[in-house]
């Protein structure tokens, strides 16, 4: 299965960096729990949270039943990979939900530099709103990115290419100091709101902290070189 390769890569990176993983599970119509459990037993991944994507309670309970049997000590939760609005529309009600998450990105309605910066205080506000119905359960925020990533109910990335140059889940400003400054601003407001965890971007690649080493030429709209640190 495709997810096995991605899971192995994530586990290897986490162990190399000495960090834990928060794994988002998109179950789909026929979830392959057998392959996932085999990978968990073989690789002993440092997973802190398993977060079931979407608002379907049956998906959460299916994952909780399968993963609780292996006794890894990780917490089971739910998340929305779109934004807080979708989480608020389908609030988790099960007492078995041990953690709650949602994604943050600044480009739903506006895309210019000023609007992106002006929306930073909202990062704290949505956390405070979430606390009203999540109680004392950990709030696990992420992915925090410059553009929307996965769409709930859709296993594909953002989809169409923007003007034929960049995928919709990529922003050319990822390589700019502006994004580094925006990240610091987001960290400030999320820390003020006392979130339990915040995951920004990816390790390497389009949405990473640096580009991959074996990348071919990037489009002009994404001025990066192999191994560049953003």
Whereabouts are the PLM-identified features?
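Short, acidic/polar
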Residues: 7, 30-42, 84-92, 178-188
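Aromatic/acidic polysaccharide-binding cleft in carbohydrate-active enzymes
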Residues: 142-228
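Structural recognition of alpha->loop->beta junctions
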Residues: 38-50, 92-103, 185-197
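Short, well-ordered coil/turn segments that N-cap beta-strands
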Residues: 15-21, 44-48, 72-75, 96-98, ...
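Structured alpha-helical segments in the cores of large, soluble enzyme domains
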Residues: 7-10, 126-132, 186-188
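Noncatalytic carbohydrate-binding groove/subsite architecture in carbohydrate-active enzymes
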Residues: 53-177
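Aromatic-lined substrate-binding rim segments of carbohydrate-active enzymes
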Residues: 2-42, 57-74, 118-120
